[in-house]
Amino acid sequence: EIYTLSLHDALPIFGAGLPHVSIPRRAVNRIVLTGTVGLSAGARSWALYNDIDVVFLSRHGNYLGQLSGPRSTTSARRLLAQAELAENDHARLPLAQAIIRAKIRHQLNVIHRAGRRDRAVDITTTCGLLRTLLADTGHAGTIDELMGIEGAASTQYFSCLAALVPDDVTFPRRSRRPPKDLANAALSYAYAILLSECTGALIAAGLEPSLGVLHASTDKRPSLSLDLMEEFRPLLVDRTVVSLLRSHRLRPEHATASEDGEGIWLNREGKKALVDGYEATLQRRVKGALPGFSGTWRRHIHHAAQLLGRAITEPDYEWTGVSWR
């Protein structure tokens, strides 16, 4: 179903003659367009003038790109620092280790929280293995070794997470291209949205998203965005998806098979349920997750991007990630 979206005293976003949804301008801080959706020239100008990011996702939720206003504060000094770090595997290893440590810590916390609600699932073995892998990050001598530890942790983590979803949801393991079941379809779709959030936050912080620390720099992906989102994957996406599945707000009928039968994608109702849950998570206010900072999780992503910028440009700054219990 296609809607005409307009802003009070502003511009129509989609063509005339379609169902109409009205939203106050002050309530808009980002426009996400999914699939083959048009955006008028007037709407583009309004968004750019007001520093409203316009994010484009494919109909399957893959991040395609975005329009961003002139607020980008990328400086030559910061860009040079990023480039120098990206080309020095030895120099970027400590920050890469910190990124993976933060991710594994949050994976542990997600399992602990879900396990407390479902005593029938034994999380002891998985938690023990994750703690061992968490300690191993400090002994990784190369980025490749570190990525191997991260992969091992994710395998253990998703295996345990699969036991925490309802019996009518098939979730044997993490599958990506394409996702093979409802849980994986929801994770992939939400990760794509989170990637756009992180890319926008990095641009706002004056950083170049393609120059990564953990993920190798390339023109084909926003590597630093993937770095920033690592710790937020379990924190914001995984626990949201598990919560939606356990509360049956996301159900098997919300998934549909691809035309070639190779993958599973969310249908319109599934996307709405997921986006509603994701937005509720990002609008939740938290305090103490970052030193001296409080606000919504969305604001935490932006603040975390600024701190990541400090870690890149200030060698003595120790980046530790978000603290979440």
Which residues are covered by each model-predicted region?
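A surface-exposed, charged beta-strand/loop segment in the N-terminal or early-internal portion
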Residues: A27-R30, T34-N109
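Short helix/loop capping segments that flank catalytic or ligand/cofactor-binding pockets
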Residues: I13, A41-G42, G65-Q66, E197, ...
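N-terminal ordered "arm"
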Residues: A10-T36
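Single conserved hydrophobic/aromatic residue that forms the stacking wall/gate
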Residues: E1-D9
